[in-house]
């Protein structure tokens, strides 16, 4: 998934969605069981980038969100990626951030990992790192349950990643670094509520197949072991 720029700042986007709900009240605007988010978008932290692969790779990542828990089995076939993401998790880089992108038409992913919630943020001072473990299957490249890195071009990985909740075919350009073990039903519930963008002229929000999740998804904490 390419990194994208949000149409406006997070606070403006969230506030504007009330304008679409009044004219589309028949559509749900929240996922049952989700708590009210409290995080604020912020600039990505500046952290030291790992220069070598961890001698003992983490095996599991647990993402605690305001809507529930997502558990990921980490793939040793992407050792540098797993090392870098584990470093970010241990530094609490992801804590108090939002998943900023949901796609529901043709491509089925929830994208997270940018503290600015604008789709173009990565750790300050980090250089893009190499792609690893690219899909071997050129027909169904990213099946449901896959977790992969977002990037803007080859070898530009940072902190953004996407969770695939339905079978998705994309160019085989995105590092696969994990598989969802628990939490896939939650992602399907998030999909049903949908995504939106904001019209820059009117300021009104509208439903779209590629935008900000209608149900805000806040990452409370990320742990690895």
Name each model feature, range by range:
Residues 2-4, 8, 13-225:
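Cyclophilin-like peptidyl-prolyl cis-trans isomerases
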């Amino acid at each position: 998934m390419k990194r994208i720029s949000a149409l406006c700042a997070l606070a403006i986007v969230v506030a504007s969605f009330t304008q679409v709900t009044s004219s589309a009240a028949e559509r749900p605007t929240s996922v049952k069981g989700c708590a009210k988010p409290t995080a604020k978008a912020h600039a990505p932290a500046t952290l030291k980038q790992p220069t070598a692969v961890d001698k003992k790779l983490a095996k599991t990542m647990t993402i605690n969100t305001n809507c529930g828990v997502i558990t990921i089995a980490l793939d040793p076939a992407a050792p540098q990626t797993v090392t870098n993401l584990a470093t970010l998790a241990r530094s609490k880089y992801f804590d108090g951030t939002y998943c900023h992108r949901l796609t529901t038409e043709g491509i089925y992913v929830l994208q997270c990992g940018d503290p600015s919630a604008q789709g173009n943020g990565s750790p300050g001072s980090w250089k893009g790192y190499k792609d690893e473990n690219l899909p071997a299957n050129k027909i169904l490249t990213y099946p449901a349950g896959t977790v992969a890195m977002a990037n803007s071009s080859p070898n530009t990985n940072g902190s953004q990643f996407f969770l695939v909740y339905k079978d998705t075919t994309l160019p085989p350009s995105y590092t696969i670094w994990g598989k969802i073990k628990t939490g896939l039903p939650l992602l399907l519930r998030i999909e049903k509520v949908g995504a939106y963008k904001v019209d820059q002229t009117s300021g009104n929000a509208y439903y779209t197949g590629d935008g900000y999740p209608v149900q805000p998804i806040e990452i409370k904490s990320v742990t690895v072991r």
